Structure formats: structure tokens, C-alpha cells
A protein has these predicted regions:
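Membrane-interface helix/helix-cap signal primarily in integral membrane proteins
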Residues: 1-132, 353
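Short amphipathic alpha-helical coupling elements at transmembrane boundaries
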Residues: 93, 108, 123, 168, ...
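Hydrophobic alpha-helical transmembrane segments in multi-pass membrane proteins
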Residues: 118-290, 354-378
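Helical transmembrane-bundle signal
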Residues: 168, 272, 305-308, 337
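Hydrophobic alpha-helical transmembrane segments of integral membrane proteins
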Residues: 279-326
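C-terminal regulatory/interaction regions
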Residues: 315, 319-378
């Protein structure tokens, strides 16, 4: 399910002219009639796509038509889909004891579910440039893979990588195949294969390979704003994060804490710079407080996310333990919300940008990227 509706695969259909069986294609339904992977039987009408932008977006998903259901019976998911549904249900139950906004943020960080966000909070996150925190992507994949590899450090390399690959697959099932998730997962697979073969994985090559493979397998991703932002942010981090970090370290000096601050600053500025043209052209606004908000909020994200993951997983076998993990995550969630509230609710938090300025930014970022690549090759 997404903002365009729920994509459903048809395996059987009956109408006045006859009955059909097999892989019949996909249709788009309004809302989310059940957990992902749930089978359903419905009566309704197939509707052709309209000519408006919303219908065009639905068409680009590869669906054949819209489906307006008048009656629907939804079953329970089976197999791995059932496991994923259990983990999602556990995550939702574990945050019931938290303050509502903190619980909604936890679900956004862990499984990408932002349905609990109120309009004010959602707007604050957008204006403060923090919306990417609740769009599950590379950082979440890194946390999952890192945790599995560390916990399995005593195992053989092939077994550790196999467990990490399995955990990555389950993670994608739980959060859903969103564009940013697919990009991050594909890069994770490339990195795991490189480790298995004993080779070093170059981030830029991994990003290019992941982007090409995903675009070939799911051509509709090229129309996805989430995919554009995910690829652009990752490319920006690869190209400019180190240079930005070193620049700040020259100003504030060296040291472990200062190096950590420099790394956080570098990642934040590099990603913000890379996605700025896309945000300007699509939304017509840019966050003024984004770099500062990210610098303040991002340090709390790993702990809030890890504790949220632990709550979701342990909740499937021991609810009290999940409650403890959720309770421990509350201060970190509260800090992120505080940053969003104070840096995202003012009129000056974002600025309107004209299309001409957006294209100028696109040229600037492109030239900077090409220049960086040329300098690295010399």
C-alpha cells in the first residue's frame, strides 16, 4: 500500500464474457484492505485510468486498471508474509504505552508506517527536512545488517553472510518494497556478495549496479519520487560526505567526538545538497533549517531505531520485554520530535523556490558531481 493505493495481483477473474485463470496482471485499489500478501475475494468494477496526474501515477506502477470493490473478503497472509505481518503487529502493540506522537514516530522509523502522524507533525518534519527519517532506507538496512553481522561474529563468514541476507529479506518483507527500501536492499546484497567473494565493494559502483538492476526489474521505479530522492541522497553522501567532514574538522579541530560531529555534518550536508534540486522542482520549497535539524536529530535515530526493532521482534515472544525496549526508546523519540517542533514549525523553516532556481540548482549539483568524479580519477 502507498499514497497511490494498494497494488493487487489478479489470479482469477469472472465477468459476463467468461472466467479467467492465471497471472492476469495487477490492479490498484483504494486504501489498504488487508496486510500485504493477504489473499482476497472481491466483487466490483474495473475502471480505466483517467487523464489526471493521480491516475497517471497509478498507471506508471504497471497496473492495468483501477478496481472499485463493492464487496470484499480478506484472508490472512501465509508463509513469510504471515511472519512479516506478525512483526508489524508486534511493533504497533509495543508503542501503545508511549505518547501518541512518539509511538507514531517509532513506527515510522522501524517499519515506515506514518499513518499515525497528525498533520502538524508531518508538516514540521517536512519543513525541518526530517521526512527522510521515516522513509525506511539505507540507514535502516545498515542497522539490520550490522546487528546481524556483529551478533554472528563467532560464526563462519559464509554462515554470517547467509544470516545477514535472510535478515535483509525478512526486513524488506516487513517494511514493504518501497523504492528507497529496494535501493538500499540491492546495495546491501552487492556488499554481502563482495564480502563473500573477499572483494572490496566500491559504494559508487554498488549504487550504479543496484540502480540499473532495479530499473530493469521494475521500470516503473524511474517515475518514483522516493527512488529519485534515495539515489540522489546516497550519491551525494558517496561524493561529498568525506570532504564536508574534513572541512568541518579543520575548523573545530581533531578528536574522537569532533570527528564524529564532522562525519554527521558531512553526511547531512552532502545528502541535503544532492536532493535540493529535486525538492525544489517537485515541491517548490527548500528547508532552511534542514542541515541544523538533521545534525541535531540524526544522532538519536540509531538508538531509537534499534530499540524499536528490538521491541517489534521481542514482542512476538515476550510482550513485557518489548515494553521495556519501547520505554527505553522514548527519550530518543522525544528528542527527535523536539527538534522537528522547534525547527519545523516557524514560517521561516522553509523558503519558496522558483522553477528557474530549481533548474539552476540541478546544473550546479551536476557540475559539482562531474568535477568531483574527474578530480578523483586524476
Amino acid at each position: 500500500a502507498g499514497s497511490l493505493g494498494t497494488s493487487a495481483s489478479l489470479s482469477a477473474a469472472s465477468c459476463e464474457i467468461g472466467s479467467f485463470q492465471g497471472e492476469l496482471g495487477t490492479v490498484i485499489l483504494d486504501g489498504a484492505p488487508g496486510e500485504p500478501g493477504s489473499p482476497f475475494r472481491a466483487t466490483g468494477y474495473f475502471l480505466p485510468f483517467g487523464s489526471d496526474g493521480f491516475s497517471a501515477g497509478r498507471r506508471r506502477t504497471g497496473a492495468l486498471a483501477e478496481f472499485d470493490a463493492t464487496q470484499m473478503e480478506v484472508g490472512d497472509p501465509a508463509g513469510l508474509d504471515r511472519l512479516a505481518a506478525t512483526v508489524r503487529a508486534s511493533a504497533r502493540r509495543s508503542v501503545e504505552g508511549l505518547e501518541p506522537r512518539a509511538g507514531a514516530l517509532s513506527l515510522g522509523l522501524v517499519i515506515g508506517d506514518t499513518s499515525g502522524f497528525d498533520v502538524g507533525t508531518e508538516g514540521s518534519f517536512r519543513r525541518a527536512g526530517l521526512s527522510h527519517l521515516v522513509a525506511v532506507s539505507g540507514s535502516n538496512v545498515a542497522i539490520v545488517l550490522g546487528a546481524v553481522l556483529i551478533l554472528g561474529s563467532r560464526l563462519s563468514v559464509p554462515l554470517r553472510l547467509s544470516l545477514a541476507g535472510a535478515a535483509l529479506g525478512i526486513f524488506v518483507l516487513v517494511v514493504g518494497p518501497e523504492p528507497s527500501v529496494l535501493r538500499a536492499a540491492a546495495m546491501g546484497v552487492v556488499a554481502l556478495l563482495a564480502l563473500l567473494l573477499g572483494r572490496r565493494s566500491e559504494p559508487l559502483q554498488a549504487l550504479c549496479l543496484a540502480t540499473m538492476v532495479l530499473s530493469a526489474l521494475r521500470p516503473t521505479l524511474v517515475f518514483s519520487l522516493g527512488f529519485w530522492l534515495s539515489v540522489a541522497a546516497t550519491l551525494g553522501i558517496i561524493l561529498w560526505a568525506s570532504a564536508a567532514s574534513r572541512s568541518l574538522e579543520r575548523i573545530i579541530g581533531s578528536g574522537r567526538k569532533r570527528a564524529w560531529l564532522g562525519a554527521a555534518f558531512g553526511v547531512t550536508c552532502a545528502a541535503q545538497f544532492a536532493v535540493a534540486p529535486i525538492l525544489a522542482l517537485v515541491f517548490g520549497t527548500l528547508s532552511v533549517t534542514g542541515p541544523l535539524a538533521n545534525l541535531l536529530a540524526v544522532p538519536a535515530v540509531p538508538l531509537a531505531t534499534i530499540l524499536g526493532f528490538l521491541a517489534a521482534v521481542t514482542g512476538t515472544i515476550a510482550a513485557p520485554l518489548a515494553d521495556v525496549c519501547a520505554f527505553l526508546s522514548a527519550p530518543f523519540l522525544g528528542w527527535i520530535l523536539w527538534v522537528a517542533d522547534h525547527l519545523g514549525r516557524s514560517d521561516w523553516s522553509d523558503a519558496a523556490v522558483s522553477p528557474h532556481a530549481g533548474w539552476a540548482l540541478m546544473v550546479l549539483v551536476t557540475v559539482a558531481g562531474v568535477t568531483t568524479l574527474c578530480v578523483r580519477r586524476t
